[in-house]
């Protein structure tokens, strides 16, 4: 193709400038930039130059110095005979931790002690560098020499915060405590990270201990409760922190309990057990809902619930959704909490049959037994037109089903097998939609017809074929499911499978996938069903099939795997062809592609390109071309924006700073490389890593 000569000329021009040593010209500052610098360092510009202890301001950028030199009196500036060579030596000595050289250069009075180091080296003032790297001796030397102790980073962190975030030693903190640093400006989020001794020291009356921080407007007590830091919570309470303070969601520290010990401390300090957040939930509601989260110590949750109830928490409090703690205990299937609430006079706020159905849906056997009444088995439908069999099929707890079958033995099997919903789905259809294979087997034993059709003429096999659930298809065929039954549009379950494979083939147009499709087509036509379903199961072994199973498959088969979209099948096909590992696919769910969360999409492709097996199987060029064509058909995303993130991590960053010739050169080379290799136009970007060109 025709080379971009203009781009090549610009690259050559920059290289010649770098070779000749000609410095980059700094951009002209705006009046706003000049004013901002003057305001920041106003105190330094009015120093008494006779005072031997001079605090030198951070370096005035050259372009600012030129603009302000006409208005500033020479007598107001520090009396320093600045030497650029000595300044370079000073910064080098800081990096090398050469204390003797540093002392020598400071005494020469030819350096700016608060000067920022060159980008890529220090990137901060020498004192900030000393604090971040935990070098207390160097920090003391610089402070004694007049370094600015109130200097802040670009994101507003002072020296104390830098020490906290970088886990500095006690010596560094002790040094900072002896200075007159402004602690009032400290970020309380950083303060909460301190170990308890320093945390206690810094909570001085000058600080407003009830100051809220972060986007949720939380106090130190909120943070201590959330992290279960007992000592910090006690110290905060001893300093008269407001235990009833609410964050932006209306939650107090008591809503964030992790252990009963924290509950004891907060309750002793007067925390209100009836405080409600913006969803109307009390600390008891929140504690019970915690039990439904992964990686939670369920014993701790039980102890918290017990502690709250003993302290007077209302077990019948209703949130804005109309739920009581008892109903949440039923929904999360926690029998111990359910029994504890019943023992402490928890009442039903809803219809008993409705709660009974909730217990069935969550598979809560204890609640099912407690709520059961004989008349519930007389085929009663709830307000949604469903009866108890629907909820058993959804919940999938065979012990619950066995219990109700025993209770229903007088009525026989006829009532059990009569139920259909508005779409004429039987409990077997519903169980298949939710991936509940064991319940399907139990229903069949009770006399349900495994080949029953719904209003669309579909059997359970049609549903499983649409969900790409090959393992269940295989097992149901063994149980007698008929593969030749057609739905109302004349399609069998195997016809549905073929349609899905054709959809993938059209999207990717890859020879390997086409061969696999043809092979599966032959297998299907010859009737070797076990081989066909085995292939389907292997096809789903990329991790996505397992993910659906783990999530209960509720509703996802209908929304994510419909043939009109085929997005999930497209990316799953890529996973199969390129031998991606399970973790890569599990990090990428197709519906995220259509949301604003482009980051996960970009991360997916970064991981894909880092995958050695993928690189060995398929070239980057062909993959990028495939992806580019796909995005052209789906203009919801700007392909240039995402393509810029398709390279291995660390190559290309976010924005180009035109005053840096080296970075500009790398960015231009990147632009040229992409235009030549992929016939694409990359946005101008700054390169994080100089090893750009492969």
Curated annotation (Swiss-Prot):
Keywords per UniProt: ANK repeat, Repeat
ANK repeat start-end pairs: 122-151, 155-185, 216-245, 249-275, 279-317, 321-350, 351-382, 384-413, 423-452, 456-485
Keyword hit for Repeat: yes
Family annotation (Gene3D superfamilies): Ankyrin repeat-containing domain
Matches recorded under InterPro entries: Ankyrin_rpt, Ankyrin_rpt-contain_sf
PANTHER family: ANKYRIN REPEAT AND PROTEIN KINASE DOMAIN-CONTAINING PROTEIN, ANKYRIN REPEAT-CONTAINING PROTEIN-RELATED
Protein name, as recorded: Putative ankyrin repeat protein RBE_0921
């Amino acid at each position: 193709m025709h080379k971009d000569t203009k781009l090549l000329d610009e690259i050559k021009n920059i290289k010649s400038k770098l070779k000749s040593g000609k410095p980059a010209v700094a951009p002209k500052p705006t009046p706003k930039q000049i004013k901002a610098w003057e305001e920041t360092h106003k105190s330094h510009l009015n120093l008494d130059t006779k005072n031997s202890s001079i605090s030198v301001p951070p370096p005035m950028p050259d372009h600012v110095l030129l603009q302000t030199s006409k208005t500033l009196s020479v007598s107001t500036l520090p009396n320093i005979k600045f030497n650029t060579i000595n300044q370079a030596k000073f910064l080098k000595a800081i990096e090398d931790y050469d204390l003797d050289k540093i002392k020598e250069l400071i005494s020469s009075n030819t350096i700016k002690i608060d000067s920022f180091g060159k980008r890529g080296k220090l990137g901060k003032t020498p004192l900030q560098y000393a604090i971040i790297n935990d070098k207390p001796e160097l920090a003391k030397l610089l402070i004694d020499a007049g370094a600015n102790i109130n200097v802040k980073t670009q994101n507003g962190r002072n020296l104390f915060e830098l020490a906290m975030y970088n886990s500095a030693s006690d010596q560094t903190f002790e040094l900072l405590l002896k200075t007159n640093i402004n602690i009032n400006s400290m970020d309380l989020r950083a303060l909460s990270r301190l170990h308890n001794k320093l945390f206690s020291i810094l909570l001085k009356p000058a600080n407003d201990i009830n100051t809220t921080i972060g986007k949720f407007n939380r106090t130190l007590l909120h943070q201590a409760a959330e992290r279960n830091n007992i000592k910090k919570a006690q110290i905060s309470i001893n300093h008269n922190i407001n235990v009833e303070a609410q964050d932006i969601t209306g939650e107090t520290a008591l809503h964030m309990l992790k252990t009963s010990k924290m509950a004891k401390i907060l309750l002793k300090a007067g925390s209100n057990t009836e405080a409600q957040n913006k969803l109307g939930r009390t600390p008891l509601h929140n504690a019970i809902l915690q039990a439904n989260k992964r990686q939670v110590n369920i014993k701790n949750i039980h102890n918290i619930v017990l502690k709250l109830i003993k302290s007077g928490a209302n077990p019948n409090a209703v949130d804005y959704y109309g739920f009581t703690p008892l109903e949440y205990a039923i929904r999360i299937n926690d029998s111990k909490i359910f029994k504890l609430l019943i023992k402490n006079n928890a009442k039903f706020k809803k219809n008993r049959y409705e709660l009974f159905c909730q217990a069935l849906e969550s598979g809560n056997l204890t609640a099912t037994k407690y709520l059961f009444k004989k008349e519930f088995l007389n085929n009663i439908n709830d307000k949604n037109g469903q009866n108890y069999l629907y909820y058993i099929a959804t919940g999938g707890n065979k012990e619950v089903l066995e219990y109700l079958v025993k209770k229903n033995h007088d009525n026989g099997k006829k009532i059990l097998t009569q139920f259909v919903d508005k779409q004429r789905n039987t409990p077997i259809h519903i169980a298949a939609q939710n991936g509940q294979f064991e319940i399907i087997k139990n229903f069949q034993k009770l006399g349900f017809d495994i080949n029953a059709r719904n209003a669309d003429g579909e059997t359970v096999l049609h549903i499983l074929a649409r969900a790409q659930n090959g393992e269940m298809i295989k097992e149901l065929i063994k149980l007698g499911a008929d593969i030749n039954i057609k739905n109302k549009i004349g399609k069998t379950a195997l016809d549905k499978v073929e349609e899905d494979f054709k959809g993938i083939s059209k999207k990717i147009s890859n020879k390997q996938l086409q061969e696999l499709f043809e092979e599966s087509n032959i297998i299907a036509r010859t009737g070797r069903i076990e081989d066909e379903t085995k292939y389907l199961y292997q096809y789903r072994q990329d991790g996505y099939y397992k993910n659906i199973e783990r999530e209960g498959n509720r509703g996802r088969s209908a929304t994510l795997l419909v043939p009109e979209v085929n997005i999930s099948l497209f990316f799953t096909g890529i996973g199969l062809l390129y031998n991606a590992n399970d973790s890569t696919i599990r990090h990428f769910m197709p519906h995220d592609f259509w949301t604003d969360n482009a980051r996960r999409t970009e991360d997916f492709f970064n991981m894909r390109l880092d995958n050695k097996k993928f690189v060995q199987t398929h070239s980057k060029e062909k993959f990028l071309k495939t992806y580019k064509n796909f995005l052209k058909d789906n203009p919801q995303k700007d392909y240039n924006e995402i393509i810029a993130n398709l390279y291995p991590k660390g190559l290309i960053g976010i924005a180009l700073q035109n005053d840096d010739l080296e970075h500009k050169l790398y960015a231009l080379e990147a632009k040229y490389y992409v235009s030549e290799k992929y016939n694409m136009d990359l946005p101008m970007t700054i390169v994080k890593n100089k090893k750009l060109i492969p």
